[in-house]
């Protein structure tokens, strides 16, 4: 189906965090809000219509994901990433940050080290610190306007700090890097060597363009 991506919808004054934040903080309202992953085009009409039917029912009780939900998810990953995942592998969470925090608590103990690569989506450091784990940063290198992984530093930080868990952002937010297969393989090799568990946030995996192709960490 065709979709009009050029339609402009004014979201100011609608309790929209993305646009109202500037006014609420006494800043110029013309500031471009590039700090949050919030789309500026309306939801698909089919989705809005389905939600409308649900709200018309008038009861907002507990619900559960049924088979069509799982089949859509499994089909998407097989079609776009050639990965045949199993329904039993899936765990529903309220959101990606909650999932990251749950992983930190499940796979590490207070006082243990968790690795990240800054600059990175700010909740990464929050879920580590808020759960009393130690933040270890292996910063990305900016080379000729292009961010790269410093693998020597990456391995040294893991070894010197006895890192237990690595939070990977793939594709990387905010630098926009779509990691290549060989980069993910090298990450995997190092982490396996030192027994480091990798938690990969791939929420932006569907948003690549041109010759960039997202590679799943699991299948690399």
Language model features by range: what are they?
Residues 60-189, 206-214:
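Conserved core of the PLP fold type I
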Residues 33, 115-116, 199:
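A structural signal for short, well-ordered beta-strand segments and their strand-loop junctions
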